[in-house]
Amino acid sequence: MQKLAAFLKRFHSGPAADACEFLGCHTREDGEGFVFRVWAPHAQSISVVGDFNFWNTEDLPMQKISEGVWEAVSVYAKTGQAYKYCVTGPDGRIVYKTDPYANRCCALPDTSSMIDPPDGFEWHDALYRARTAKQSAIKRPVNIYEVHAGSWKRHEDGSYLNYEELAAELVPYVKDMGYTHIELLPIMEYPYDPSWGYQITCYFAPTHRYGTPKQLMQFVDTCHKAGIGVILDWVPAHFPKDENGLFEFDGTCCYELSDPMMNEHPDWMTRIYDYGKPEVQSFLISNVCYWLRYFHVDGIRVDAVASMLYLDYNRRQFKPNKFGGRENLEAIEFLRRLNEAAFQANPAVMMIAEESTAFPLITKPDYDGGLGFLFKWNMGWMNDMLQYMSLDPLWRKGDHNALTFSMTYALSLIHIS
């Protein structure tokens, strides 16, 4: 109880990098059943429904144990069973929600969470991790193969390769081609099959499309034994408005900003996180630490950083910050805390910003006024190179500046091209 009380204090004052160790579904200390905890500060009531209670909304009501954290215990719940939270909002409307901290999700169209604790996998990558821990990635050769697991290769019937099949075919290919890392486009659970996975509905659950969480761990283990690092694309800039997801989780704007002028992304029609809330910071930061700890990933590429940094990003109207500027001060502070927590979890981690503007000091440490990333994705060089190669060869001689322009800013930050 003392550990829980200490966590709740950290969670509400923020950020708590270990939030995933307390929230979600966890095995009870005595090993009998599971405890469920969820953050929903404005909910009238919540109950846990699932296979273990025949989805009876009155069988397992949750109790509020702090400012917005609810808890329930079931001795009947078992690994592999599905569950959801039945949330009654302040207006009395009832919505069935996926657990934000769920470690696994059921196969679509079922949007239920599944009980599946992430521990218990036997790793064989100690030598690889010891070797990479000795030297920063800045001083090591890096050659990254970016891949979408669902479209790199498929079976003849169009079905996806699972993680075991990907490991058997992708890892030897990457090794033979001289790459040092595989970067996976988002493999967290997402709702729309034809997409690349950038609208995430469950951040702690690997998508069901390619196998189980343990099979993803096996994929990473196979990569490491072959000397290949694994980087994950990660999306803290926005989330979709699927009713079962984070969208208005407790019947109000819970994870997202409450201001209707600012809480929706104009390009993607998705919701934007409220980075000023300690509980939201804890959710996102603990998610990165979760992937580093339980899945042994070597790097995190943070997607759409520019959309986080600017309040007027692709907006005609916006509300300036307290100094009258366009910078999102809460997002800037969040990114600093994120990088600090990530490097505490794994000092050798590659924290990469996918940032498309000239925002200063992205790869400088916090104490130098920077954001604390290790690398910035060199989108400028990429766009210039693609533009140059798209020209008719006859006209390229007049556009050689596209090849050299990136050299004017190359030394201001640490780039990955």
Where are these regions (language model features)?
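Short proline/glycine-enriched turn/loop motifs at strand-loop junctions of beta-rich domains
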Residues: 39-46
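Conserved alpha/beta catalytic core and glycan-binding cleft of carbohydrate-active enzymes
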Residues: 296-298, 313-417
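Short, acidic Ser/Thr/Gly-rich low-complexity loop/linker segments typical of extracellular
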Residues: 57-67, 376, 384
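The feature marks proteins involved in alpha-glucan
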Residues: 1-35, 63-146, 151-158, 165
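Substrate-binding/active-site clefts of carbohydrate-active enzymes
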Residues: 126-141, 148-327
